[in-house]
Amino acid sequence: MSSAPRRPAKGADSFCTPEPESLGPGTPGFPEQEEDELHRTLGVERFEEILQEAGSRGGEEPGRSYGEEDFEYHRQSSHHIHHPLSTHLPPDARRRKTPQGPGRKPRRRPGASPTGETPTIEEGEEDEDEASEAEGARALTQPSPVSTPSSVQFFLQEDDSADRKAERTSPSSPAPLPHQEATPRASKGAQAGTQVEEAEAVAVASGTAGGDDGGASGRPLPKAQPGHRSYNLQERRRIGSMTGAEQALLPRVPTDEIEAQTLATADLDLMKSHRFEDVPGVRRHLVRKNAKGSTQSGREGREPGPTPRARPRAPHKPHEVFVELNELLLDKNQEPQWRETARWIKFEEDVEEETERWGKPHVASLSFRSLLELRRTLAHGAVLLDLDQQTLPGVAHQVVEQMVISDQIKAEDRANVLRALLLKHSHPSDEKDFSFPRNISAGSLGSLLGHHHGQGAESDPHVTEPLIGGVPETRLEVERERELPPPAPPAGITRSKSKHELKLLEKIPENAEATVVLVGCVEFLSRPTMAFVRLREAVELDAVLEVPVPVRFLFLLLGPSSANMDYHEIGRSISTLMSDKQFHEAAYLADEREDLLTAINAFLDCSVVLPPSEVQGEELLRSVAHFQRQMLKKREEQGRLLPTGAGLEPKSAQDKALLQMVEAAGAAEDDPLRRTGRPFGGLIRDVRRRYPHYLSDFRDALDPQCLAAVIFIYFAALSPAITFGGLLGEKTQDLIGVSELIMSTALQGVVFCLLGAQPLLVIGFSGPLLVFEEAFFSFCSSNHLEYLVGRVWIGFWLVLLALLMVALEGSFLVRFVSRFTQEIFAFLISLIFIYETFYKLVKIFQEHPLHGCSASNSSEVDGGENMTWAVARPTLGPGNRSLAGQSGQGKPRGQPNTALLSLVLMAGTFFIAFFLRKFKNSRFFPGRIRRVIGDFGVPIAILIMVLVDYSIEDTYTQKLSVPSGFSVTAPEKRGWVINPLGEKSPFPVWMMVASLLPAILVFILIFMETQITTLIISKKERMLQKGSGFHLDLLLIVAMGGICALFGLPWLAAATVRSVTHANALTVMSKAVAPGDKPKIQEVKEQRVTGLLVALLVGLSIVIGDLLRQIPLAVLFGIFLYMGVTSLNGIQFYERLHLLLMPPKHHPDVTYVKKVRTLRMHLFTALQLLCLALLWAVMSTAASLAFPFILILTVPLRMVVLTRIFTDREMKCLDANEAEPVFDEREGVDEYNEMPMPV
């Protein structure tokens, strides 16, 4: 600076003001006096004393550990950005020096290295230096008791101003030098952002007293608060062009104006280069790790004060993301505003320009050029990571300052860019609400409240000044807003969430953090400017987002329209990147710009580029999805191989430990089918696994969803009980009918729900058991054996077989029952259902043939027919029993229109139930109404067709046979207890032993249905928490069936469709599902109460016998047909039969088509078809009882024969179990698509 000799300043003498009486005529001129004062003030000794004095005021606690951010901060601020020489202590505050504590040791200043080398800085010393500066600044905030707030000055020119005021008391004092005096602000709404163009035009709108100087033209008012002074070195960063006295744009320049005027231009340039340019590798001190034990930062332990202390490192844990793209457009009044044009929760949703409504979610398609432009702008734009701001104006001010510093925009464009950032935000949902506008911008709120203030009231410059083209704002305005608490909302204005907002909030995850993307064209800029901001903490920015979600990231891109850049596409690109899981995790964990660029490169590596050719149809793009899946799979594999090198995952020890715990838990997962090698070991493990949750099985039922599930499952269980009961009565001549099946379902259901390991299973009668009952009844009738007595001995053998299977832990055998066997079984039962339906219908047409038009009135009709018609008429009354199953003269024959009405009832029931099931996944009505209608489709179809039949009084139809009260179906044939030794004649002893063979066959059916159903319910995708018990459930179901045979009740098994429906009804889906994404399971209400109540309600249904007697058998045939047709859904064998008649070019894009040659696929289908034909042939002969044995032979056939014909790769494609739980509402997809099992 100056080479003149200087006297070291002593104490407060360097700040003393000369006495007025000492200024006489003989006093030397003021220029010489000012130069002497300036030399004494700017002396090196004085500067060194200030540093020593500041360093003696305490510091941070030793032992603080530094990171790379601290070192970068130290290099950028402490060594290259110096404090202004005008920031001296006032006289009173300077006298109070903090004495050194008793434990404080004197230390050598690091800059006083005697050797002239670059000294090495201890970390503890660096902390103490920073703390000393901070406490020195805190001392400034405490005025002395004898001083008034207005007597505290902070700048050198203010000290000179005080000297000039004292000199003005002398008559001979000349005109004072230009100065500025700062006084405290009057109120929160003060006008503080006005830049002075002329000294005479200074406006004091908020009580801030400005000077009347004439030489300070072009400089803003300096900010000063009484008793308050704090330094933030990061905010003091400036470019060199701001330091000139004539071109100063900021109030606190790093050099004094007097000093700047005295120095030459070369000296000023040297000063700018020294203070503001960051030359890599120059004057960087070596940092040696300090071996102190304490790891707590000294900043944490300071007492609160006006000096902002450094906060701990910002949490970088990735959150779910919500991205909103806002573009700078003109509204209908031709005023600029930020308008939302797209949003991302997981997929992109665009606003349709014409209708102003949201389009369908879709995968964002980006142009490759926009991605490259985005990477280039990120490489050269402003990147602010962990910005500590809480309001949009504060963030905007920091962004604009960083743009000026990085020379992206000119200094004169600062105000325009700032005003552009603070424009109003509008959303498509704003116009849908007819109430008070939901999003209130700063400008509209100011205009709204302006009518309630008087003329003398002070106004906030944020809401009264125009947004574009007004007076530029200064740092004073934004800092004042940051320091003062946020204003309270005005009375009478409340922010209520609209219906649209609440619906959108349900789709957004609870802990999501938002990203705001602002892009647009502004003509006042000469080139594009960009800023990427990551806030230190997520904050809610008022009137910015469509929904109140805290904002963590902001991206800004402004530029002229003349630039060769598509701002909209670049905004879509960064929005899509932020919605990508890997990239937004990298954005959370990024420490510098290079991390973001690396994440963009990783995104480009997994992106798919389509050639610029015309696509004639969507089928041409089928390979894109497959190729993208391969790229994502490769990306996941690379992430698993290099989790730490990629920098995309947290590296903390806690996260690593948590990951290891999860992996260990997955590896040690308890497999319920794993054998223990001990007798009944699996049963004991099932009891130990499931019974500790017994009490919670009742507590978890206290939920409204469980009550709704009870009503739904009741009808789902009652309809098959009535249907199969009526058909079973037809097959067994009413030895077992509706009453027996209802009682069996109720009793076994209650016991199973109280003792079973998986209470979500619904046990009931099924098609395979119906086929076996018919076959065994035919066998007993042909051999003159008592059917019910034979069932008793089969029941005894069933119990022994179940005990033997559980003791040997044989439930693991269910793993060998592959899709090959399951599909053959399910297809066979579906064919039987369909065949039986039309067989019964043909039989009705044979018993009641169609007559000609004159036949009904002719006299050729004999008296027997007239008498049967007369007998048939009373059956239409509600109090008469149905004559179904009776022989002789009691059963009417040859009735007119009976066959046609039966056909109408059967077809009507089938089509109503079938289309109501389709309606469940249609697009009509809200989803909740559709699900209710679809779930109750079968009861609704039965009710409608019963009313149709009841309304036609002139036509006879055969009704369901149901007894009155608690009675068996045919009391004249049997009772409730069956004698094992024989009812009418002694039962043969050889048959008691031979009953083992049919018992094995029944056990095969029950084992397959129960265990496969348990496997389907227990899939990992269903997220069950309490586990299942294969051995315990099998033992209970088979043992109860054996005991129920003593009472003439039918055997039951786990009904697959009803069990899956029960589990789905108790599944709670997460509402935070992105539009277009698959629904996710939140929890499953695993409890016993719903199954228990359903079983009791089914048992009580026996009292509605009068209502059940009104159901025609033709309606049950329609339900039978419905179950047969719907069971074909999800059977891959049925789909491959279609491919036999389809050209290869029309084959679907599935695994077994793409990975297996067409001829080999057709060969596999032919083998399944051959096995199905063999089973059908067996069931059509007298050996139909052995069909379960033929079915189980398909298991070794698949394991031995097919593995020699097909390769392992082909078998994995053709025989893989790819069925997953179905929860979404895709058309034509429901529970039947999940299981290749019969109904």
Curated annotation (Swiss-Prot):
The modification N6-methyllysine is found at K272. One of its GO terms (molecular function) is chloride:bicarbonate antiporter activity. A lipid is attached at C1171 (S-palmitoyl cysteine). This is Anion exchange protein 2. GO terms for cellular component: apical plasma membrane; basolateral plasma membrane. Residues 76-85, 94-110 have a biased composition (Basic residues). The lineage of its organism: Eukaryota, Metazoa, Chordata, Craniata, Vertebrata. Residues 845-895 are extracellular. InterPro entries: Anion_exchange, Anion_exchange_2, Anion_exchange_CS, Band3_cytoplasmic_dom, HCO3_transpt-like_TM_dom, HCO3_transpt_euk, PTrfase/Anion_transptr. Residues 141-155, 189-207 have a biased composition (Low complexity). Glycans are attached at N857, N866, N880. Sodium-independent anion exchanger which mediates the electroneutral exchange of chloride for bicarbonate ions across the cell membrane. Plays an important role in osteoclast differentiation and function. Regulates bone resorption and calpain-dependent actin cytoskeleton organization in osteoclasts via anion exchange-dependent control of pH. Essential for intracellular pH regulation in CD8(+) T-cells upon CD3 stimulation, modulating CD8(+) T-cell response. Residues 1-706, 917-931 are cytoplasmic. The modification Phosphoserine is found at S113, S132, S144, S170, S172, S241, S441. It comes from Pongo abelii. It comes from the Eukaryota. It catalyses: hydrogencarbonate(in) + chloride(out) = hydrogencarbonate(out) + chloride(in). It is a multi-pass membrane protein.
